[in-house]
A protein has these predicted regions:
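Active-site beta-loop-alpha junctions enriched in small/polar residues
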Residues: 8-12, 35-39, 76-79, 115-117, ...
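Active-site acidic/histidine proton-transfer and metal-coordination neighborhood
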Residues: 19, 59, 63-66, 73, ...
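Glycine-rich, proline-tolerant flexible connector loops at the mouths of alpha/beta enzymes
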Residues: 34-61, 114-122
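Glycine-/proline-rich flexible loop or hinge segments
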Residues: 41-47, 75-83
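Boundary/entry segment of secreted carbohydrate-active catalytic domains
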Residues: 1-15
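Catalytic domains of carbohydrate-active enzymes, especially glycoside hydrolases
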Residues: 18-40, 105-109
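Residues at the starts of beta-strands that form the adenosine-phosphate
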Residues: 4, 31, 70, 165
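Residues at alpha-helix boundaries and short interhelical turns
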Residues: 11, 54, 68, 82-85
């Protein structure tokens, strides 16, 4: 397997896609990851348009191929398990649409985060438990893993249907933030997940 050097175009969010790709190519990069929702806007990927038009998808992929570059991943980092009504459902929908778009574009990797639920069904905010030394925190984790297993089982099925892979970043403030927690999610849900990065971005 050949190592591909690339970049996440969020670092050039203030440039149009073509200009951003020219900057990356000028720095010797050939692999590209673009944002499709979650925490930040997606200026380099108009998801609704691409989902609705085969011609738009062909033109979009042509932006990369005409420069000798490859779109290797869609990024929808967010918290799909967030109990806040204006956050979790939107991020979850962004993830579903990203998977559907990846299938339509022939992209294999969806870069994402596991998300973090609240501590209980009535929680208003996410709760990140790192070191559960007390029984109440074990109860919190049991609830959170139940929530995660249901959501990620759905996502696993959607990923399989679209022949894509969920590449989960093990990131702080997420239920999956270490190799141990990643393995737990895979054991609960299924094998169409991987860990593309072992460190957080800076």
């Amino acid at each position: 397997m050949t190592l591909k050097l690339g970049a996440y175009t969020a670092c050039l969010h203030d440039r149009p896609l073509g200009e951003a790709l020219d900057v990356l190519k000028g720095n010797g990069l050939t692999s590209v990851e673009v944002n499709t929702g979650g925490f930040i806007p997606s200026p380099h990927c108009h998801v609704d348009l691409l989902l609705s038009s085969e011609q738009a998808r062909a033109d979009y992929l042509g932006e990369f191929s005409s420069r000798g570059m490859e779109l290797t991943g869609l990024n929808c980092n967010g918290n799909p398990l967030n109990p806040l009504p204006g956050v979790g459902p939107k991020h979850a929908d962004d993830m579903r649409r990203s998977i559907e778009l990846a299938g339509a574009l022939g992209i294999n990797n969806i870069v994402c985060m596991s998300g973090t639920p609240g501590s209980d069904p009535d929680a208003k905010y996410p709760s990140w438990v790192v070191n559960p030394w007390d029984g109440v925190y074990m109860d919190v984790l049991d609830y959170q893993w139940d929530v995660a297993a249901k959501f990620w089982s759905e996502i696993d099925g959607l990923a399989r249907a679209n022949n894509t892979r969920m590449a989960i970043e093990m990131h702080p403030h997420n239920l999956v933030f270490s190799p141990v927690t990643l393995k737990k999610l895979v054991d609960l849900v299924g094998p169409r997940m991987s860990a593309p990065r072992w460190t957080r971005r800076t």
